[in-house]
Each structure stands twice: as structure tokens, then as C-alpha cells.
């Protein structure tokens, strides 16, 4: 077995597929999910190494795994304690498959317990950054520096290892920070190598994927595009598809893919609900209709959506009403333009994760919903939806969609457009949405985007936008007392939107944005800056 991290050949950018397609002879790493918030992030990290990965339930049987024939298995972290009576367990026959296994946090503790070791509540939990001291630098820890920072988040610890296991690394508070049974290719880490805070975490994941599982870097953007087009054609055949085009990278990439797959059987419809940013509806129609000759049906539904939100202040109700009205408009327009059999949506992994995030109840052992917020693409769909869904991007993260978009010729201004929520400015207005408040926020938001664009900093941020609060503050302008709205600036740095940090913006830029908003946007006399990270906050205010 090689002891050097493989240097990958110059391959195209890597991406995942949408489903487990048994017809394809594809190497795969399976992640068994025990309710961790990072399970999909593990999958993303593996895909970045040009190896396909899929997240499955922890209940997946050893027999099913044998049929799937993965090159390796990863047991995710989770919020529970393995010594609880109803703690989630994996099929113990997994250990007899002869497939390499890596347990992460809870996954490592479960491995230890099921194989005869012992796990107890730690005298002192370990949360945040920790220095990893390496005792055995082979296999899993090849090219991981001694003293490297890793991210810990655990209240339990392994106090006795199963027979055949040895300690690979420790930290100040955790004796068994990394363990291994080299003969059986069973490995465990108490930390989270998948998160950005773990400095050499990617090196460790590559070691598992390439050294231990002996995978090859075969998963590419081109492979995803080719397979997705084949899957769309196989599913849709000669049926007609209706696509909700928003102008963002998700729906635009989907439009290009669908147009390549089914041509004129695709109808793109842009429903202008009145919640988009300044100038976006006009620019969208120009790009698709005139520049790329992909016909788009324009529907002006601004008054309908605004009427639905009269008197509504609850953010979840806003999302539900917008989602419901969106589908209602779709159904009405489909009768006029149809018939249509499929509704195409640019749903992504983070949409699915945040709309129905799951946990495992320690009392019952069952997965339960821990709802964060209803996404426009997911939570707002009515139960009587007439369309069948086609969601080719459902397993992709935002950066992966951008890679696909770029590879199929999507304009760079769309590829690198900041993420924008389906309900648009309606959920950046805290409280009731009115025409007046929309105009205030739209103008303030334009100033933010205009200034960071002038400074050449647009692509330095994951998102940069304004939020309008439902309060007023006292000010003085031209020797006159004012009583007007405050605007919140939200500029975010992130890799994937799963976690995010507030951006350390130069004071001069903040000052310029603030001065312009106060002077150019009628009804605003104060600007504040949001310095909350995700978690504990979310990127959007609603």
C-alpha cells in the first residue's frame, strides 16, 4: 500500500450524480447517516476528490451494502450517545463485509462499542479546535502534520478499544482521537475532518479514499452532464416539461441541461412575482430569449403575490403562501400552454437538508424532523400538486452547480451570481411586505451590489444583501428630525452555504454603502452591519 498522497491527474471538475444507477460501473463511497448535520458535507468532500459518494440511512443493511458494492463506508457523526438504550445502530454484519470503514465522531464510538470496546461520558467534553498529536503517521494519517488543528464536538469518549485496534493520534483531552484496526481496514476519528476548521481534514479523507479504499479519480463534470442528460431523456421521453426559471444559477443550469436533453419539449416560464432585485427581470429575458434563443414565457403576477401577503408577518406563512401561489400560477399557465407532464425544479441538497433536517430521538431511536425553515422549492409545495417532479440537481451543492453551468456554456454573470432565495425580497423584509417597503429594500439592495461591484469585490462574498426591519429610528438630516427605517447589511463568506461567517469588510466600503443608502434611498436614515455567523444564525433573516 502506497504511503504517499496520490497526485491526481489533470481531470475535469468533479461532481456527483443524482441517483444510484446500478447500470453504471462506478466506484463509490457510502456514508451512513446517523443524524449528523455534516453527513452531506462528507459526501461533498469525497466528491471533491473525484470519487462518487452517496448518503444512505444508518438502517441500510449489510446485504444491501453488499449489493451496492462500495469501495468504502463512512459512519457519520450524530447527536446521540451510543450507550443510550435506543441509540441508532448500524447492522453489525457490516464489520464482516471486508469493506474499509471510517467512523467519524459518533460513528467511531459506535464502531468501538459494537466491536467490544467501551464508550463513556467524558469527564470533560471537547468542542471546537484541538491540536492533533500523531502517534502513528501511517495509512489514514499520511501527510497529516503533527499538531494539525482538527474540529472536535463530542461529550463522550472511548475508554477501551476493541481487540486489534491501536491509537493513531490523541489530543490534550482525548486519548483516542484516531484509531485503527489495520488488518481489517477499520478506522475511526473522534474529530470532524470534513469541516473547514480541520486544517488537514481533506488530506485524511483523501488517504481513506485513495490509500485505504483504493479508489480511482473517475467522477467528473462531463460524466455528470452526460449521465444527467441520459437520465432526463429516459425519464421524460417524449413528454413535455415546464420549468420555473428564476434567473439564478440553479434554474438556469437546469434550463440549459433540459434544453440539451429534450429541446422543444421544454417550456421555460418566468413568473415575475415582484420580489426580484432591481433590473433582474429585464436582464433575464434578454439573456435567455435574445442571447441564447431559449424561449421564455413571461408572466407578470406581481399584484397577485402582493395581495396574498397583505397583513402577513410570519416568515413561514410568507414562504408557504408564496410557494402555493407560485404553483397556482404555474397550473393556470400550464393549462393555457400545456398540457405538461413534468415540473422541473432546481432543488439542491441544502434546500432538502434545511427544509426537513433530521435528528434521531434518543427515546424512540426514530428519525424526527428538526425544521429550520421551509424552502420555496420544497416546503411550499401543496399536497395536491398535479405535476410529476424532475429534479436533476437535487444532490448537488451550489459550487457543483456552478461547475456544471460553466461546463455547458452558461454566462459567467449567471454562474457566479450570488444565491437568492425563492421568495426573494419578501423574506428580506421583516414583517409585512408592501409595495412601498419593496421599493425601499430594492433600492438599498442595489446600492450594496453596485458598490461591491465597483470595488471588484462582488465575488469575494458568498452573499451580499440588505434587510429591511419593521421598526423606525430617530435621525437628523438637514437640521430636521427624521423618523425612518434602518437597513441591515448582510455580507457573508462561505464555501457552500452550510456554514457561513460574516465578512470582515473594509470600513471605507461600509461607510460608502451607508452614505449612499441614507442619501439615495428615501425612507432610510440608519444602516447597521450584521456580524452573526451561521450557526448560530442563518444567512437569511427569515
UniProtKB/Swiss-Prot annotation:
It is an enzyme of class 6 (ligase). It catalyses: XMP + L-glutamine + ATP + H2O = GMP + L-glutamate + AMP + diphosphate + 2 H(+). GO terms for cellular component: cytosol. The keyword Mitochondrion does not apply. ATP binds at residues 246-252. Residues 219-417 form the GMPS ATP-PPase domain. The active site is at 105 (nucleophile), 192, 194. CDD domains: GATase1_GMP_Synthase, GMP_synthase_C. Its EC number is 6.3.5.2. GO terms for molecular function: ATP binding; GMP synthase activity. Pathway: Purine metabolism; GMP biosynthesis; GMP from XMP (L-Gln route): step 1/1. Homodimer. This is GMP synthase [glutamine-hydrolyzing]. The lineage of its organism: Bacteria, Bacillati, Cyanobacteriota, Cyanophyceae, Oscillatoriophycideae.
